[in-house]
């Protein structure tokens, strides 16, 4: 399949916390969909090695959730660096989407973009400057038509690939129930 400018890149990061000045990326996953939100390809799911010092500095919430999911152990045993993750992810994305055309898609992608800008600038530059942020739609629906929210429940696994799949399903739900397209 040739790279298609209409395809969308979906991304999720798991991090040690919310502040890129002190926290680090633990995991990255990407998916590519067509413009109708059909999944075309799954990119590499990469746990990025971080030092024991970085992992120990995580707050209780992150320790609990990333520990329960097994991510902390995957990060400890990983041989992948941030540079490896950048290269593998760009290699994958280049097969499906030309550089600079896809918005960054996902939930709370502004947060992901902050971390990419700090630690994976070359990957952040692969995206268009625009975002398709499912969180924005969710926040509007919660305020304007809260009954609709009862129809979609997130699992909240805090595993990058599963979170992306859930973001796509959530946008499909809003497309069908809110936008009625």
Curated annotation (Swiss-Prot):
Q: Which UniProt keywords apply?
A: Cytoplasm, Exonuclease, Hydrolase, Nuclease
Uppermost EC category: hydrolase
Q: Where does it reside?
A: Cytoplasm
Q: Which Pfam families match?
A: RNase_T
Q: Name one GO cellular component term.
A: cytoplasm
User: What are its E.C. numbers?
Assistant: 3.1.15.-
Q: Which residues form the active site?
A: 129
Q: Name one GO molecular function term.
A: nucleic acid binding
Keyword ATP-binding appears in the UniProt entry: no
Its primary localisation, in coarse terms, equals cytoplasm
Q: Which InterPro entries match?
A: Exonuclease_RNaseT/DNA_pol3, Oligoribonuclease, RNaseH-like_sf, RNaseH_sf
Q: Does the keyword Nuclease apply?
A: yes
Biological process according to GO: DNA metabolic process
Residues forming the Exonuclease domain are 8-171
Instruction: Describe the function of this protein.
Output: 3'-to-5' exoribonuclease specific for small oligoribonucleotides.
Q: Which family does it belong to?
A: Belongs to the oligoribonuclease family.
Q: Which NCBIfam families match?
A: PRK05359.1
Instruction: Quote the protein name from its UniProt record.
Output: Oligoribonuclease
């Amino acid at each position: 399949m040739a790279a298609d400018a209409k395809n969308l890149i979906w991304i999720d990061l798991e991090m040690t916390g919310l502040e890129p000045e002190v926290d680090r990326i633990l995991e990255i996953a990407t998916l590519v969909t067509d413009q109708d939100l059909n999944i075309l390809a799954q990119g590499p799911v990469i746990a990025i090695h971080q030092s024991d010092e970085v992992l120990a500095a995580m707050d209780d919430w992150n320790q609990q959730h990333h520990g329960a999911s097994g991510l902390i152990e995957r990060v400890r045993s990983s041989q992948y660096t941030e540079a490896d993750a950048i290269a593998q992810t760009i290699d994958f994305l280049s097969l499906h989407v030309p550089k600079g055309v896809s918005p960054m898609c996902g939930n709370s992608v502004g947060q992901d973009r902050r971390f990419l800008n700090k630690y994976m600038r070359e990957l952040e530059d692969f995206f268009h400057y625009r975002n398709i942020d499912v969180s924005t739609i969710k926040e509007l629906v919660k305020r304007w038509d809260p009954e609709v929210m009862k129809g979609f429940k997130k699992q909240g696994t805090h595993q990058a690939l599963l979170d992306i799949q859930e973001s796509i399903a959530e946008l499909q739900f809003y497309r069908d129930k809110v936008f009625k397209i």
